[in-house]
């Protein structure tokens, strides 16, 4: 049975290790190279395409960036590392490999890296450090940017794809940076000769989102809200004045303060013979972000 002294020794050792990790994050991350199989799996999951730029935060000897560029002539790369000696060696290796015109390595803290032009972000760092970088990635990387890690995850941000071979092989994960859907949006749809104004409100945590809308004095919840990079889709079933109980399926893309795409509407047809007959209409749809939240405007007792 463990004694109190042995238990305290374990606690002390764990505390010392945590302190070591914290100091390493503040000063430098000791370089431990990824094994070739993991590197290849990371690159395959990221699938960089011609014209894209990949960034490796904590690039070490450059092996992940090199693997992403080799055999892909249209891909450009950037490695960021806090170890000046490794940066110098990586730039020399890039020239020796004939990649000097497409890749560069810079001596920089990962928290200072410019992520705005990245299409792919690679990371293989301390798990705590990757978690600390998560807010920067979500705030600065473009929607749709692929983030690929080996071994460790990014906390509560659930991956969009996982390559897990089981056994002792580390899992490789990929995330798509989600567009910012959260907030208030307004749009209009023309149905049966009437203009219907939608005042919508979305809540979001990473790629998970939900929302509701108001049309006139009625409110309803959106169903099946999906955010994947810039792409967004959701559905709605709601009674609309002059149209009846209408089914709407929205598909579009979020670009800054606009959301644009198409909506498929299924509208009940006025028929004495078949009350299930529907008229199907597809139309363009454009929403704009707003600071005036119509969803909260007074409703009154007349909800027709």
PLM-predicted stretches and their roles:
Residues 76-81:
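Conserved SAM-binding motif I beta-strand of class I
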Residues 91-113:
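S-adenosyl-L-methionine
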Residues 62-66:
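Glycine-rich SAM-binding Motif I of class I
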Residues 51-58:
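Conserved class I S-adenosyl-L-methionine
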Residues 1-15:
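N-terminal secretory signal peptides and thylakoid transit peptides that target proteins
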Residues 181-293, 299-303:
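Central antiparallel beta-sheet cores of small beta-barrel/beta-sandwich binding domains
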Residues 130-180:
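C-terminal substrate-binding/active-site "lid" region of AdoMet-derived donor-dependent transferases
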Residues 17-48:
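Class I SAM-dependent transferase core
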């Amino acid at each position: 049975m463990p004694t109190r002294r042995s238990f305290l020794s374990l606690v002390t050792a764990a505390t010392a290790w945590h302190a070591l990790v914290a100091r390493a994050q503040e000063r430098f991350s000791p370089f431990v190279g990824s094994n070739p199989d993991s590197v290849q799996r990371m690159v395959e999951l990221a699938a960089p395409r011609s014209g894209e730029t990949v960034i490796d935060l904590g690039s070490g000897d450059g092996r992940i960036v090199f693997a992403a560029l080799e055999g892909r002539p249209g891909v450009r790369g950037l490695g960021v590392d806090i170890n000046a000696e490794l940066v110098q060696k990586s730039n020399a290796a890039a020239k020796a490999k004939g990649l000097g015109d497409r890749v560069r390595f810079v001596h920089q803290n990962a928290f200072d890296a410019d992520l705005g032009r990245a299409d792919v972000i690679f990371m293989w760092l301390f798990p705590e450090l990757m978690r600390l970088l998560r807010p920067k990635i979500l705030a600065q990387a473009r929607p749709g940017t692929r983030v690929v890690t080996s071994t460790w995850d990014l906390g509560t941000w659930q991956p969009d794809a996982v390559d897990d071979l089981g056994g002792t092989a580390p899992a490789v994960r990929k995330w798509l940076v989600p567009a910012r859907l959260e907030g208030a949006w307004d749009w209009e749809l023309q149905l049966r000769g009437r203009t219907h104004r939608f005042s919508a409100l979305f809540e979001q945590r990473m790629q998970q989102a939900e929302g509701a809308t108001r049309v006139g004095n009625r409110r309803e919840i959106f169903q099946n809200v999906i955010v994947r990079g810039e792409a967004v889709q959701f559905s709605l079933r709601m009674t609309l004045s002059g149209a009846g109980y209408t089914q709407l399926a929205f598909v579009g893309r979020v670009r800054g303060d606009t959301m644009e795409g198409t909506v498929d509407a299924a509208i009940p047809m006025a028929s004495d013979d078949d009350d299930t007959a529907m008229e199907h209409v597809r139309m363009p749809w454009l929403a704009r972000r707003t600071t005036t939240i119509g969803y909260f405007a007074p409703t009154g007792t007349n909800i027709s």
